[in-house]
């Protein structure tokens, strides 16, 4: 067969380079990966014979279209236009304003339709020459003034008539009465007595404030007028008193809030200059027999999102909507998850831009540049060795085309990232250069999920993912009588029941579900089941997975208590930091100490290990290796409720063979452990979340599959066990979550030994001794600063700091037991509040910052505390403005309208729960209303008085909608 000429190879090479221009492939430069893409994706598109990869690479090199440096290939740079599609942003029309991007909330006032925003502007506007003025006037109709605690503050608001005709001032009244604010005048206007205001005249109205609480006290005040022959009109002002401690003032906004106005909708032309990737010391002997595709999204999908809904039945939006709204079933499994994952990726492209940096310097360190990235230590953004970002010169921001320098991550230390850029940039680098930086995200999790969704039905998993019955076949001929590894499991009826059903395999081919509410020993039960399978079936091969490294490490640690390390192999991802691997896990993980790198042994070398432990995404490596059918007899997934369904399926499709009485009688057991009432996966795409990606496999089965439905007699123990004994929380802390989420079935375990859960029942700070709960009411202000869209509330931080001081300074006295900072956790749903609380504790407050080990006190979001517990939990809810509640619901923020987040937050505490928040705002949510009523009934409420607002006073927006503003 004749060989291809260089010209012919060049032609195919050009086609391959064009093929790589797809957004999901264009950043790839590793020679080995490019070879795989060429062989497995490009060449297989048609049956036409094509040159080898080495031939086209040679042709591109000699024609100066590519450069090869070792294992890295750099193709000639091409111009491209960058467009992103935000699914939170609707296309503009003449009558509506686009919804903000996630985290990109409006700059002032609550989110509202344009008509309502215009109404507020009209409400505060002077009319007919009448103006409202005071010494504390601020923009947008705001009057803000400082007050000191327990001292009356008085100032004057002047109603001035600058017009040519008299007007009548009928009344001055707040739309909602506030006990701190009162309004007085000589002629009784504040009591409804009319007053004629002649041209050039002014009338003073006194505003008085007296408060014994720090906070933010705001009333919207309406001045009602009439003028003949024009009729009545109104002018409004927002009058707010602010009582602050020095700490609160210090923690206030560092700069006025100015929302980040990203030019995301403006297509730009860029040229990419490739960088220098780190040298890979990875030893990968694990086979790659099943290819991993790139799974790019179609460009037309992005266009569909940008165009938005269309009324035409044959529009691309309607076609997409039809698939999204179709019930998930085996016939559309691949197509639906393919679409959901594409939508997720398109939104990820938008969201990663929140971390863009502008006008930032870098420092040269030999051949690398060092960049400070705030938040990288918390994976905000996530930056790992081998990832890449893009940097461009700030001075060339308006140039077209714009040169983007691709920088590969060589290492991450705290908040400093080491980057390898092209020699071209390094030659022009000087210390005073400023850069604009754009981050990227790792597509590997998306790729393995795409493959899993595609393989699921190919591998016959419909009876696993859509189970309808059991084969009624036990793995035991007689009665299973276990020798328990953990005696506490033996004493717990539900845990014992779950283990027995898992080991006998009576649910197969249907998965077995462990429904584990907070503190009920879900992971303990799962680990005992794994140990029993390992002990009872000498030919069993077990894959144990979890969504995160920390959860997978915990499985490994607990298994090692009874199983020798020679049977267990913990496979870490290549990006995992070895310093973070627990010491007792290191001897059985895939780190090669002599080579100082992770290794991935061949299937042959993995065979002696009967238990493999990985994260769900890393299980994709095992799928690529193509183990023989039936190799893994059991797959266990802990914390399954945290993962999107395709992520869980990564550990199933291609690894677990469906149980079959004839061909696979002893295998096919899938066990899922989790709690559908706690936080599930958090997709970035609102479309994907709404249509199934926000529901875990565990939750879908429990919600929509008859085998896992709860009857009057409870759950069918052949398929699911709900654990009932709570070992974590004091019964008072458990009561409300138990009622709201668990049908009041949970029982607080009471052992004979001294119980840590009772340690704070006699603490002097408790409003009611014996009830270790405090709800401290605060009337604060939702604030933002600079370009951060996240909210904070300094009034709540003050209270949190005061309680911390009492807990950590009164140890062993006044009923307060000895406690270390690491036994205390502080939860807040907003990133900026978390940052401000940390700043107060470690830097601003002189008492707390001087305490030893104060850095071990964890402050974080609800998501960061899921699966964890602390002796004491403090919660700062932040929200004090009911007008933002719809925003929280839209963007899945905060506690309100998010019962799962509330459930997780309340159930982290063992012995003491302190909640700080605005009761009037929180009570608008039915779940919070129940908790507040419980605190008040039990005498556990203190702080700012809590009075439920009447429905008619629920919203400023409602008032604006009903007002007659006049002209």
Swiss-Prot record:
Motif DEAG box boundaries: 638-641
Compartmental location: Cytoplasm, P-body; Cytoplasm, Cytoplasmic ribonucleoprotein granule; Cytoplasm, Stress granule; Nucleus
GO CC, alphabetical: cytoplasmic ribonucleoprotein granule; cytoplasmic stress granule; cytosol; nucleus; P granule; P-body
UniProt xrefs under SUPFAM superfamilies: P-loop containing nucleoside triphosphate hydrolases
Entry keyword Nucleotide-binding: yes
EC nos: 3.6.4.13
UniProt family annotation: Belongs to the DNA2/NAM7 helicase family. SDE3 subfamily.
Protein name: Putative helicase MOV-10
Protein's organism: Gallus gallus
């Amino acid at each position: 067969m004749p060989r291809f000429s260089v010209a012919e190879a060049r032609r195919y090479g050009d086609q391959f380079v064009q093929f790589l221009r797809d957004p999901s492939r264009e950043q790839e430069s590793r020679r080995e990966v490019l070879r795989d893409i060429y062989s497995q994706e490009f060449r297989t598109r048609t049956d036409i014979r094509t040159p080898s990869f080495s031939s086209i690479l040679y042709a591109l090199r000699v024609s100066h279209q590519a450069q090869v440096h070792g294992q890295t290939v750099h193709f000639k740079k091409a111009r491209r236009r960058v467009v992103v599609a935000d699914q939170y942003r609707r296309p503009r029309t003449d009558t509506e304003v686009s919804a903000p991007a996630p985290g990109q909330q409006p700059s002032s006032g609550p989110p509202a339709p344009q008509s309502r925003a215009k109404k507020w502007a009209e409400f505060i506007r002077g009319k007919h020459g009448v103006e409202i003025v005071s010494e504390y006037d601020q923009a947008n109709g705001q009057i803000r003034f400082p007050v000191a605690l327990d001292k009356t503050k008085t100032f004057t608001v002047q109603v001035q008539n600058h017009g040519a005709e008299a007007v009548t001032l009928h009344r001055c009244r707040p739309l909602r009465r506030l006990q701190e604010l009162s309004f007085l005048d000589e002629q009784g206007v504040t009591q409804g007595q009319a007053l004629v205001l002649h041209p050039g005249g002014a009338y003073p109205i006194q505003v008085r404030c007296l408060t014994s609480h720090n906070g933010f006290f705001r009333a919207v005040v309406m001045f009602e007028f009439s003028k003949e022959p024009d009729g009545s009109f109104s002018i409004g002002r927002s009058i707010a008193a602010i009582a602050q401690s020095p700490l609160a003032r210090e923690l206030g906004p560092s700069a006025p809030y100015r929302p980040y106005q990203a030019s995301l909708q403006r297509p730009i032309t860029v040229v990419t200059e490739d960088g220098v990737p780190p040298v890979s010391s990875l030893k990968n002997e694990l086979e790659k027999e099943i290819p991993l595709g790139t799974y790019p999204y179609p460009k037309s999908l992005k266009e569909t999102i940008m165009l938005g809904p269309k009324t035409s039945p044959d529009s691309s939006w309607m076609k997409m909507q039809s698939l999204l709204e179709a019930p998930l079933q085996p016939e559309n499994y691949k197509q639906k998850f393919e679409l959901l994952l594409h939508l997720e990726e398109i939104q990820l492209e938008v969201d990663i831009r929140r971390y863009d940096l502008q006008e930032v310097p870098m420092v040269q360190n030999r051949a690398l540049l060092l960049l400070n990235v705030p938040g990288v230590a918390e994976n905000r953004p996530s930056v790992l060795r081998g990832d890449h970002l893009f940097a461009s010169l700030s001075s060339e921001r308006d140039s077209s085309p714009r040169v983007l320098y691709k920088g590969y991550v060589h290492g991450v230390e705290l908040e400093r990232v080491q980057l390898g850029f092209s020699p071209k940039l390094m030659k022009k680098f000087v210390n005073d250069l400023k850069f604009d930086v754009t981050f990227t995200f790792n597509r590997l999790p998306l790729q393995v999920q795409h493959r899993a969704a595609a393989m699921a039905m190919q591998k016959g998993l419909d009876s696993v993912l859509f189970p309808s019955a059991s084969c009624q076949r036990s793995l035991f001929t007689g009665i299973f009588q276990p020798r328990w590894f953990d005696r506490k499991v033996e004493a717990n009826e539900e845990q014992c029941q779950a283990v027995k059903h898992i080991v006998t395999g009576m649910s197969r081919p249907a998965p077995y579900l462990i429904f584990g509410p907070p503190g009920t020993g879900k992971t303990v039960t799962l680990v005992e089941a794994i140990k029993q399978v390992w002990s009872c079936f000498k030919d069993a091969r077990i894959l144990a997975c979890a969504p995160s490294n920390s959860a997978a490490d915990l499985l490994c640690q607990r298994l090692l208590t009874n199983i020798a390390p020679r049977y267990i192999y913990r496979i870490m991802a290549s990006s995992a930091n070895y310093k973070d691997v627990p010491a007792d896990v290191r001897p059985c993980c895939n780190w090669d100490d002599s080579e100082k790198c992770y290794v991935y042994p061949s299937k042959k070398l993995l065979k002696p290990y009967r238990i493999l432990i990985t994260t769900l995404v890393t299980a994709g490596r095992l799928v690529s290796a193509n183990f023989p059918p039936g190799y893994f007899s059991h797959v266990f997934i802990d914390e399954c409720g945290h993962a999107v369904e395709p992520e869980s399926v990564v550990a199933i499709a291609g690894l677990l063979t469906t149980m079959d009485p004839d061909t696979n009688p002893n295998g096919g057991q899938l066990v899922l452990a989790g709690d559908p009432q706690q936080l599930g996966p958090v997709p970035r795409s609102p479309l994907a979340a709404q249509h199934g990606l926000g529901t875990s496999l565990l939750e879908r089965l429990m919600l929509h599959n008859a085998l896992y439905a709860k009857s009057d007699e409870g759950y069918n123990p052949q398929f699911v066990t709900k654990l009932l004994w709570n070992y974590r929380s004091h019964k008072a802390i458990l009561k409300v979550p138990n009622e709201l989420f668990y049908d009041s079935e949970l029982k607080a375990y009471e052992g004979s030994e001294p119980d840590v859960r009772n340690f704070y029942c006699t603490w002097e700070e408790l409003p009611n001794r014996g009830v270790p709960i405090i709800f401290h009411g605060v009337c604060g202000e939702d604030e933002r600063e600079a370009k951060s869209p996240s909210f904070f509330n300094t009034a709540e931080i003050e209270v949190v700091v005061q309680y911390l001081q009492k807990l950590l300074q009164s140890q062993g006295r006044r009923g307060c037991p000895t406690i270390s900072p690491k036994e205390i956790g502080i939860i807040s749903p907003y990133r900026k509040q978390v940052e401000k609380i940390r700043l107060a504790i470690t830097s601003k407050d002189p008492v707390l910052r001087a305490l030893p080990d104060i850095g071990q006190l964890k402050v974080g979001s609800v998501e960061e505390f899921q699966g964890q517990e602390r002796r004491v939990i403090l919660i700062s809810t932040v929200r004090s403005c009911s007008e933002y509640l719809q925003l929280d619901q839209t963007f899945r923020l905060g506690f309100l309208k998010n019962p799962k987040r509330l459930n997780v937050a309340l159930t982290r505490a063992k012995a003491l729960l302190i909640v700080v928040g605005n009761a009037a705002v929180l009570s608008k949510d039915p779940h919070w209303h129940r908790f507040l009523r419980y605190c008040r009934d039990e005498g556990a409420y203190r702080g700012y008085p809590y009075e439920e607002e009447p429905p008619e006073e629920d919203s400023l927006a409602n008032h604006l909608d009903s007002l007659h503003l006049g002209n």
